């Protein structure tokens, strides 16, 4: 049993490599071993331990980069690094452990593997909302290396794709028990499912070439180190770097800066002057991340992480406040119990906004705004493309250095475009900035650590709404029913 525990932990670490940037797809079949060892466990306690150790390794290798973010201000938060590196995997591993525990009680069921897969997706969904939610590295994102294989997102959403992926990933589990009849059923059904996915994905991509609006957009990526971003001595250098990257000879309609690009109010006279000079020289509208407040004092004062638009006449065209805040980063949960300050700059916690759409009248452009972390929540982003034209996602991934975090964040965000049939304009201070079309094609992009800008046109949205955008998570029932039907029919063929 000791040896099995070590194997589960090591395979869990290997399984974390299925996500960006490695996309080591052979590691998907580590889940087959987990599925097998749970079924063969002597009791539910053993199944729970095997699942927990696998889960701990899985989240340790997949989300280690969070500790890098904590280490940015190491003098103040050195004590939090072990909690970020090990504490989060320790907690998240319980989701996989519980899945394995419940699956154990179905070990003699003819459809054990299907039950394991259904429970896997159930706990991914629970993970997306419990304690504010963290739907990061859902197993469906393992297929985001391929624009063809992610097309089912338009129908099923990420949870439906997760069910497909975990079904395929566990299809080899009978090889360990030498149950070759079951193996034939699962491998045949997996191959059939993959074939359908490839055909559907290829058809959807080929029949939806990228078409563009006439709205010109400039994405600015200054790649300012996190330690310099809030440094008063670096403020003017940082602002002028943004402006220099924005003021180019090519005409543009929109200039987009990243999350918290403006770390001071835009109405400070000298800041306002520089911004208006830039907007007059480019004849553009600026969409930027910044800090906003409710203009009140004392106990009524509230601070927001904002996205807003300014024109050359100093009119604020819209202001959006971030709705999904990062626990411990932008606010301290249980503040009366935990006597710590948040990780980001300042002593005051940010307040939640109300979500929704924003509008730029000049271009008749209806925008679904997303600030950073908000893009990982599929239900929050779910938007019918009959009421929105584009997703604009601003972020700051400079916290996480050259780790896997910025790559994972990009591919998670990109999935929202496919789900909703909307183009995405993604602008990172540092990370991956890109123009993405409504089927997930990367039209143009800047890589991690590049200091540059992208000039391009906003892609057109799809002409019809996606199934997911209309029905949300209910649409995940479609692949479940489809796979159950295939599994049943192949069982009739191969079973003795």
Swiss-Prot record:
One BP annotation, GO: lipoprotein biosynthetic process
UniProt xrefs under PROSITE patterns: CN_HYDROLASE (PS50263)
Pathway(s) served: Protein modification; lipoprotein biosynthesis (N-acyl transfer)
Keyword annotations: Acyltransferase, Cell inner membrane, Cell membrane, Membrane, Transferase, Transmembrane, Transmembrane helix
Enzyme active site: 259, 322, 372
Residue intervals passing through the bilayer: 6-26, 50-70, 77-97, 114-134, 148-168, 183-203, 474-494
Domain CN hydrolase: 220-464
Recorded topology in the membrane: Multi-pass membrane protein
Molecular function terms from GO: N-acyltransferase activity
Source organism, top-level taxon: Bacteria
GO CC, one annotated term: plasma membrane
Gene3D superfamilies: Carbon-nitrogen hydrolase
EC number: 2.3.1.269
Alphabetical list of InterPro entries matching this protein: Apolipo_AcylTrfase, C-N_Hydrolase, C-N_Hydrolase_sf, LNT_N
SUPFAM superfamilies: Carbon-nitrogen hydrolase
Subcellular location as annotated: Cell inner membrane
Protein family (similarity comment): Belongs to the CN hydrolase family. Apolipoprotein N-acyltransferase subfamily.
Functional note: Catalyzes the phospholipid dependent N-acylation of the N-terminal cysteine of apolipoprotein, the last step in lipoprotein maturation.
UniProt xrefs under HAMAP family: Lnt
Protein name as annotated: Apolipoprotein N-acyltransferase
Phylogenetic classification of the source organism: Bacteria, Pseudomonadati, Pseudomonadota, Alphaproteobacteria, Rickettsiales
């Amino acid at each position: 049993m000791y040896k099995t525990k070590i194997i589960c932990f090591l395979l869990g670490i290997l399984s974390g490599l299925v996500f960006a940037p490695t996309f080591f797809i052979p590691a998907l079949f580590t889940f087959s071993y987990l599925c097998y060892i749970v079924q063969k466990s002597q009791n539910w306690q053993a199944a729970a331990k095997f699942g927990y150790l696998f889960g701990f390794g899985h989240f340790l290798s997949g989300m280690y980069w969070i500790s890098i973010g904590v280490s940015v201000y190491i003098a103040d938060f050195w004590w939090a690094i072990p909690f970020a590196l090990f504490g989060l995997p320790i907690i998240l591993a319980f989701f996989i452990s519980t899945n394995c525990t419940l699956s154990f009680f179905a070990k003699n069921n003819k459809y054990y593997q299907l039950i394991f897969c259904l429970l896997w997706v159930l706990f991914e969904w629970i993970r997306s909302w419990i304690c504010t939610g963290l739907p990061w590295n859902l197993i469906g994102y393992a297929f985001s290396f391929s624009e063809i294989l992610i097309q089912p997102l338009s129908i099923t959403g990420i949870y439906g794709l997760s069910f497909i992926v975990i079904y395929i990933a566990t299809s080899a589990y009978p090889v360990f028990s030498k149950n070759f009849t079951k193996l034939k059923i699962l491998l045949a059904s997996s191959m059939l499912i993959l074939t359908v996915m490839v055909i559907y994905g290829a058809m959807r991509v080929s029949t939806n070439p990228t078409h563009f609006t006439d709205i010109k957009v400039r994405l600015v990526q200054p790649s300012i180190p996190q330690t310099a971003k809030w440094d008063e001595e670096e403020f003017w250098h940082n602002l002028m770097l943004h402006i220099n990257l924005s003021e180019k000879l090519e005409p543009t309609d929109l200039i987009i800066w990243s999350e918290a690009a403006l770390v001071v109010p835009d109405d400070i006279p000298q800041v306002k002057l520089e911004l208006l000079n830039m907007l007059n020289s480019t004849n553009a509208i600026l969409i930027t991340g910044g800090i906003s407040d409710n203009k009140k004092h004392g106990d009524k004062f509230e601070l927001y992480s904002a996205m807003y638009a300014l024109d050359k006449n100093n009119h604020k065209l819209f202001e959006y406040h971030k709705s999904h805040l990062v626990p411990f980063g932008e606010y301290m949960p249980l503040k009366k119990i935990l006597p710590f300050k948040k990780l980001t700059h300042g002593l005051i916690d940010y307040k939640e906004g109300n979500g929704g759409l924003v509008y730029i009248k000049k271009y008749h452009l209806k925008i679904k705004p997303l600030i950073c972390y908000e893009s990982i929540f599929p239900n929050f982003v779910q938007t019918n493309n009959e009421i929105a034209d584009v997703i604009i996602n601003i972020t700051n991934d400079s916290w996480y250095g050259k780790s896997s975090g910025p790559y994972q964040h990009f591919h998670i965000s990109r999935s929202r475009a496919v789900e909703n049939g909307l183009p995405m304009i993604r602008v990172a201070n540092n990370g991956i900035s890109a123009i993405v079309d409504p089927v997930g094609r990367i039209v143009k992009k800047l890589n991690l650590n590049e200091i540059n800008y992208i000039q391009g046109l906003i892609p057109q949205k799809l002409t019809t709404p996606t199934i997911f955008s209309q029905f949300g998570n209910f649409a995940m029932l479609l692949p479940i029913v489809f796979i159950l039907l295939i599994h049943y029919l192949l069982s009739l063929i191969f079973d003795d």
